[in-house]
């Protein structure tokens, strides 16, 4: 009798552990590629700054179109587990092509199938609702795994790319997706769409207000991601070309920010019900403004590393609370809500990529940091019109 009673708990713990490991592995793959991508495009593919910007814009547009289509399909009848498996398999092949085929035009087609993370978070939310887990902290711990991956990934990426080659780095990312696919296949649950999900209670706003608030939140998160993506694209080149510091410092900065981001994310999740999502997002925006302004004045590695606490507050709240905000505004469409949040990052890449190369060629890297501060100002104004739930 005792054996029977403990079996479901063990199964649930194994499933939860599988979700955490999948989040970590997908995070590692992204953390290996993204920090070094602008250097890869500039040095390996000999792309000009404006072409680097166009790369991020084009790939993000394709990513939005594909992921939004799959999100609608999965909310109606699709099996999210199969979509995650498909995404992992395709990305594995794409990273292998990255390793051997250094062609700029083909590289712009490499991001449209990155639907693994939104679908994984949507599946995790549904699994938590069905099994009675506390949704906020479970989602926060999942997102923290990606942040943990970004502690390890960027320094490892620079070590592999600069110490060995970009080929070794991309093959390592491909291996991560192979392992990820095996875990998804063996341990993640399949949840049918025709079974009603019993969600934890949230405040249900009138449909018109929810749509308006969802649109405003989309603008808020898009502006926040655009500011962050401007920083991500230009920070490695700014550190090397403008400040004449070592290339490994860029990886260390990203890694430290990601490490500090984890406790910030967990603290935000803990206090969310006490102080509300909107106030937390406002704290994130103010922290981001202070961070980008301070980066312009910093000239030494020690100061650059110390400033990452502000970046961690900004990203920890955006990553941990932003997705939950969308899900609570769209409780009946968890997949679409999660993908909509993921697409704010892609819109951020579009905005950042569109202005990045042009502004660098006309002005300087400094102008981009001031632009990032302006974007956060727009986000703050829009946030004030969103109801806190």
List each language-model region with its residue ranges.
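Helix-loop boundary and gating motifs at the non-cytosolic
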Residues: 5-60, 228-242
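Hydrophobic core of transmembrane alpha-helices in multi-pass small-molecule transporters
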Residues: 24, 101-119, 222, 303-317
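Structural signature of the two symmetry-related core transmembrane helices
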Residues: 82-96, 174, 279-294, 370-373
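C-terminal transmembrane helical hairpin of 12-TM major facilitator-type secondary transporters
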Residues: 278-322
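Juxtamembrane intracellular "pre-TM" segments in multi-pass secondary transporters
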Residues: 1-13, 189-221
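Helix-to-loop junctions at the C-terminal end of transmembrane segments
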Residues: 65-79, 161, 264-276, 360
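A late C-terminal transmembrane helix in Major Facilitator Superfamily
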Residues: 332-362
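Cytoplasmic helix-loop-helix junction between adjacent transmembrane helices
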Residues: 108-144
């Amino acid at each position: 009798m005792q054996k029977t009673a403990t079996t479901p708990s063990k199964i649930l713990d194994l499933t939860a552990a599988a979700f955490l490991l999948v989040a970590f592995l997908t995070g590692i793959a992204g953390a290996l590629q993204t920090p070094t991508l602008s250097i890869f495009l500039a040095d390996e593919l000999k792309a000009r700054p404006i072409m680097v910007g166009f790369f991020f814009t084009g790939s993000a547009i394709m990513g939005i179109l594909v992921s939004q289509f799959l999100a609608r399909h999965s909310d109606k009848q699709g099996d999210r587990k199969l979509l995650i498996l498909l995404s992992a398999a395709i990305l594995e092949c794409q990273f292998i092509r990255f390793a051997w085929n250094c062609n700029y035009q083909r590289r712009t087609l490499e991001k449209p199938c990155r639907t693994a993370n939104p679908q994984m978070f949507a599946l995790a939310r549904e699994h938590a609702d069905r099994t009675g887990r506390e949704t906020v902290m479970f989602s926060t711990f999942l997102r923290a795994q990606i942040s943990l991956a970004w502690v390890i990934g960027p320094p490892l990426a620079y070590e592999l790319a600069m110490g060995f080659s970009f080929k070794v780095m991309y093959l390592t990312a491909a291996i991560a997706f192979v392992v990820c696919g095996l875990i998804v296949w063996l341990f993640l649950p399949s949840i049918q769409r025709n079974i009603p999900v019993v969600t934890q209670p949230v405040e249900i706003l009138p449909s018109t207000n929810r749509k308006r608030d969802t649109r405003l939140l989309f603008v808020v998160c898009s502006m926040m991601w655009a500011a962050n993506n401007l920083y991500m694209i230009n920070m490695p080149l700014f550190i090397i070309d403008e400040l004449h510091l070592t290339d490994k410092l860029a990886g260390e900065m990203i890694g430290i920010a990601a490490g500090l981001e984890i406790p910030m994310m967990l603290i935000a999740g803990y206090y969310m019900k006490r102080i509300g999502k909107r106030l937390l997002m406002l704290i994130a925006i103010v922290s981001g403004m202070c961070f980008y302004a301070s980066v312009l004045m910093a000239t030494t590695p020690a100061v650059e590393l110390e400033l990452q606490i502000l970046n961690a507050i900004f990203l920890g709240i955006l990553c941990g609370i932003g997705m939950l905000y969308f899900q609570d505004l769209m409780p009946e469409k968890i997949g679409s809500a999660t993908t909509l949040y993921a697409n704010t990052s892609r819109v951020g890449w579009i905005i950042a990529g569109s202005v990045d190369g042009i502004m660098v060629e006309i002005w300087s890297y400094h102008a981009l940091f001031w632009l990032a501060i302006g974007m956060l100002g727009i986000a703050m104004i829009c946030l004030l019109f969103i109801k806190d739930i």
